[in-house]
């Protein structure tokens, strides 16, 4: 998605060979026009799959998932990272390790919202080592829901998450795949092959 790639180049900041900061438009401040186009793009990719729910994780997955849900006219469920006083039992849970924050979180979704007859699109802002996506897939599995794929805004193609999911036969659609962040420069997958 060219608009997204341009935004990454213009506003993204490479903090290291593995860390890309995009907080000016995706995971702190959100660019609604960009998110609308992200939603439209994912809707095009998954429109004919019969999706009944979109499953994401708080908090940075919520904006792209919501815009996709709006385009597909389906509800969005977000897994919580912290226990809520109103969300105590009757939960699907999974353990997710964050390499960025170096912490492990138990994520949870109420059993009231995810069911065996649901057809689910899993979404997140980033795919790096795949831990968040695997946690969301585990929750969908516990619900006995059918997963049609994983939608990712930015995939770090140089990390193992995308390969790990694809090797399991999971359809992964990423709007931008970053092949390298070396030398402080963002290189996308298509550019690396030229």
Curated annotation (Swiss-Prot):
| Keywords assigned | Cytoplasm, Glycosyltransferase, Purine salvage, Transferase
SUBUNIT field: Homodimer.
Q: Give the highest taxon in the source lineage.
A: Bacteria
Q: Name one Pfam family in it.
A: Pribosyltran
Q: What family name appears in the similarity comment?
A: Belongs to the purine/pyrimidine phosphoribosyltransferase family. Xpt subfamily.
Which annotated residues bind 5-phospho-alpha-D-ribose 1-diphosphate? Answer: 128-132
Q: In which pathway does it act?
A: Purine metabolism; XMP biosynthesis via salvage pathway; XMP from xanthine: step 1/1
Annotated GO MF terms? xanthine phosphoribosyltransferase activity
Gene Ontology terms: cellular component: cytoplasm
Kindly indicate whether the keyword Transferase belongs to this entry: yes
Q: Where in the cell is it found?
A: Cytoplasm
GO terms (BP aspect): purine ribonucleoside salvage; xanthine metabolic process; XMP salvage
Sum up the protein's function in the record's words. Converts the preformed base xanthine, a product of nucleic acid breakdown, to xanthosine 5'-monophosphate (XMP), so it can be reused for RNA or DNA synthesis.
Positions binding xanthine in this chain are: 20, 27, 156
- The UniProt record lists the EC number as 2.4.2.22
Reaction it catalyzes? XMP + diphosphate = xanthine + 5-phospho-alpha-D-ribose 1-diphosphate
Protein name in the entry: Xanthine phosphoribosyltransferase
């Amino acid at each position: 998605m060219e608009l997204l790639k341009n935004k990454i180049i213009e506003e993204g900041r490479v903090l290291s060979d593995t860390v890309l900061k995009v907080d000016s438009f995706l995971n702190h401040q959100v660019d609604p026009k960009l998110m609308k186009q992200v939603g439209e793009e994912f809707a095009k990719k998954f429109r004919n799959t019969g999706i009944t729910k979109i499953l994401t994780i708080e908090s940075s997955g919520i904006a792209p998932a919501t815009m996709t849900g709006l385009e597909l006219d389906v509800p969005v469920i977000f897994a919580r990272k912290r226990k809520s006083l109103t969300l105590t039992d009757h939960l699907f849970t999974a353990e997710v390790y964050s390499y960025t924050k170096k912490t492990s979180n138990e994520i949870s979704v109420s059993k009231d919202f995810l069911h065996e007859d649901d057809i689910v699109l899993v979404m997140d802002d980033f795919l790096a080592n795949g831990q968040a996506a695997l946690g969301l897939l585990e929750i969908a599995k516990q619900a006995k829901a059918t997963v049609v794929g994983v939608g990712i805004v930015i995939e770090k193609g140089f990390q193992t998450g995308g390969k790990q999911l694809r090797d399991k036969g999971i359809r992964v659609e990423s709007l931008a795949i970053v092949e390298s962040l070396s030398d402080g420069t963002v290189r996308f997958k298509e550019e690396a092959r030229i």
